[in-house]
């Protein structure tokens, strides 16, 4: 019995250490995926290809078929969240597509056993949260900037109360909102507001990016702390390998945006960013 108690003590200590180290890694930014920058015109979308059906490495397999079906189920709530935040629904969907493809291709067994049979989106609950993969610290900043008129990310008085909490435990309520497996509205709303805040800050600085899908998606991926308004920003972000083809987060988002996929639910509205 004494031996068993010792073993259990060691196991619990190891588990505790794992979560402490994990929190420290997130806080210090050590879990941020190394990014890349797209070279030349490798993934550039030509105007003649906008909205055209075309086979690409990311839309040929069962992963895309599953994702396509899962997103169709959420089309109404995605459009609702985008409207509330005032962003292009297809831009929001583009970021969702990339995050889910990244998850599907990196978590192969979970995809085969859960996501594919049930045709559902993957909901994260550890270092990143929800179907959009938002980091907890980013979610807190999104909330903070909504109420800070001095911030370049401030959207105005009418947006201030969109994320108000209804309980006294903000951390618990935030987590519950973002990791809800059955209702993804909060995940979409946080992400839509985040996109709006990024666009607003860049426009205020004199470098509007509303028409640049790839750059906006890149900023969504790399975070507030790396968002530095400037001329000629580059498309990049985390590198995602799909069927032996390397994409950056921003390039894949742009490629989806201008593709012929999911046009019925999310029509292309931005043609000036090419």
PLM region spans:
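Cell-wall glycan-active module
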Residues: 1-274
């Amino acid at each position: 019995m004494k031996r068993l108690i010792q073993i259990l003590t060691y196991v619990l200590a190891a588990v505790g250490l794992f979560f402490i180290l994990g929190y420290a890694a997130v806080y210090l930014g050590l879990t941020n995926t190394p990014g890349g920058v797209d070279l030349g015109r490798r993934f550039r979308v030509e105007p003649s290809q906008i909205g055209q059906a075309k086979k690409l490495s990311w839309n040929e397999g069962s992963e895309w078929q599953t994702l396509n079906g899962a997103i169709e189920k959420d089309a109404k709530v995605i459009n609702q969240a985008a409207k509330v935040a005032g962003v292009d629904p297809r831009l929001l969907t583009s970021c969702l597509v990339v995050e889910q493809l990244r998850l599907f291709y990196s978590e192969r067994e979970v995809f085969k056993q859960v996501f594919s049979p049930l045709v559902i989106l993957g909901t994260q609950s550890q270092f990143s949260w929800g179907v959009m993969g938002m980091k907890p610290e980013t979610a807190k900043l999104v909330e903070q900037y909504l109420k800070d008129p001095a911030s370049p990310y401030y959207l105005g008085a009418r947006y201030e109360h969109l994320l108000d909490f209804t309980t006294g435990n903000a951390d618990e309520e935030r987590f519950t909102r973002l990791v809800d497996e059955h209702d993804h509205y909060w995940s979409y709303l946080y992400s839509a507001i985040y996109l709006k805040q990024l666009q607003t800050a860049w426009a205020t600085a004199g470098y509007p990016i509303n028409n640049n899908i790839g750059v906006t998606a890149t900023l969504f991926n790399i975070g507030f702390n790396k968002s530095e308004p400037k001329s000629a920003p580059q498309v990049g972000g985390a590198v995602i390998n799909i069927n032996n083809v390397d994409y950056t987060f921003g390039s894949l988002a742009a490629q989806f945006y201008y593709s012929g996929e999911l046009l019925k639910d999310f029509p292309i509205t931005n043609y000036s960013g090419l």
